[in-house]
């Protein structure tokens, strides 16, 4: 192998190594910032057990909103077709947050309750992630969900 070919081979190997390193760093960065969406049924089935932080999506159960008198702490229940998950949140809720409203909460499970650090309320009928829309379509078919639609259960 002559010197020119050897130099070209070293250059190609160096470029490939740099590209592999860049792809590896991008994948690790994306994994850290990725937040998976689960419904209460999936949480109860244990699908979210391996995730420290995830998003919980569903409908706010009618009559479940309880506000603390002395703080910004709010408790409510997120339901889907088959399950309910109690949620605690401390902070200012969106103006559109109310009973029978689609909601997505970002947080973690703690002692059988979902502790949210962010709550998003449905902006209008077009705002809903496809995964949540598909999961909720089976349960309520666009109709309001009564307060007794899903029993309050704690995840395993």
Curated annotation (Swiss-Prot):
The chain crosses the membrane at residues 9-29. Residues 1-8 are cytoplasmic. It is found in: Cell inner membrane. The keyword Cell membrane applies. It comes from the Bacteria. Pfam families: CcmE. Belongs to the CcmE/CycJ family. Heme chaperone required for the biogenesis of c-type cytochromes. Transiently binds heme delivered by CcmC and transfers the heme to apo-cytochromes in a process facilitated by CcmF and CcmH. This is Cytochrome c-type biogenesis protein CcmE 1. It comes from Xanthomonas oryzae pv. oryzae (strain KACC10331 / KXO85). The lineage of its organism: Bacteria, Pseudomonadati, Pseudomonadota, Gammaproteobacteria, Lysobacterales.
């Amino acid at each position: 192998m002559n010197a020119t070919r050897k130099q070209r081979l070293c250059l190609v190997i160096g470029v490939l190594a740099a590209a592999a390193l860049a792809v590896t760093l991008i994948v690790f960065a994306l994994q850290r910032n990725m937040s998976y969406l689960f419904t209460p049924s999936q949480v109860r089935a244990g699908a979210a057990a391996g995730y420290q932080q995830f998003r919980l999506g569903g409908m706010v159960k009618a009559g479940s909103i309880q506000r603390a008198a002395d703080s910004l702490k709010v408790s409510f229940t997120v339901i889907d077709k088959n399950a309910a998950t109690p949620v605690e949140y401390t902070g200012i809720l969106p103006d559109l947050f109310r009973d029978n409203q689609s909601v997505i909460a970002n947080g973690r499970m703690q002692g059988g309750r979902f502790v949210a650090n962010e709550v998003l309320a449905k902006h209008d009928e077009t705002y809903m992630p496809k995964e949540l829309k598909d999961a909720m379509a089976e349960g309520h078919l666009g109709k309001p969900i009564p307060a007794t639609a899903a029993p309050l259960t704690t995840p395993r």
